[in-house]
Amino acid sequence: MGIKKHIPNSITCCNLISGCIATTFAFIGDAKLALCWIVIGAVFDFFDGMSARLLNVSSPIGKELDSLADDVTFGVAPATILFSELNVLEYPGPLLGIKDFIPYVAFLMAAFSALRLAKFNLDKRQTTSFIGLPTPANALFWGSLIVSNPSWIEGTSYSFAFLLAMLAISCYLLVSELPMFALKFKHWGWKDNEVKYCFAALSLICLVVFGIFEAWWIIISLYLLGSILLWWRAKA
């Protein structure tokens, strides 16, 4: 039991280390390797919770450690990717005087990710689904967007405004009350899992067609749209 109880927290620490490595690559402008380490961190994040359930071990420190690791991997790392991207964009003449300060706005993503994780820890409604955009989904969206569309993003002197508008939307979604489905299964049957299986299949198709790095922003966009449609249908 002595070793077994430390396994989930050890996996969580691997998530944290992955986030630190992702952040270092993001700072030097290597968004692709940063995204790679975010994906690795997401894998560790998936298995730390699974291992805790399978081994039937839990501790108060585990939940707090998981949130701290998640904010580094899914908050600080993607914020740094956006920071580096905003640093290399062109800015119109009137903003040249403050262009060195604009990239730091990207770190609002880390702050709102921390708020989202704190809210998740206290919210008893999020056992089988999510309320607000999960931080891993947000991180994968931003990392993939920057990796797959540099020419499109850097195409005009107003690309920064588009990215900042998207940043504002994603920060709002992180702490919003929008219900979002989760890939959490109580059983493996088709009934009650139709949306989850269809989304998983669609995600796999996107990964095959667009590539393991480029597909994620499309997948997360579909996830968001699907959640909104399900919410509207439930309200109707």
Which residues are covered by each model-predicted region?
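Alpha-helical transmembrane segments of polytopic integral membrane proteins
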Residues: C20-T23, I40, P78, A111-A114, ...
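C-terminal membrane-associated helical module and adjoining short loops/tails
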Residues: T128-A236
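Cytosolic, membrane-interface loops and tails of multi-pass inner-membrane proteins
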Residues: D48-S59, F120-K124, T128, F181-K186
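Multi-pass membrane catalytic core of lipid/isoprenoid biosynthesis enzymes
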Residues: P8-T12, L54-A118
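Topogenic membrane-insertion module of multi-pass membrane proteins
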Residues: M1-F46, N193, G211, A215-I219, ...
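Helix-coil boundary and interhelical linker segments in multi-pass alpha-helical membrane proteins
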Residues: I21-C36, P78-Y104, L145-F162, V209-F213
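Active-site His/Glu-centered metal-binding helix of metallohydrolases
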Residues: I17, V43, F47-S51, L68, ...
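Hydrophobic alpha-helical transmembrane segments of polytopic
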Residues: I11-C14, A34-G41, V105-F112, N138, ...
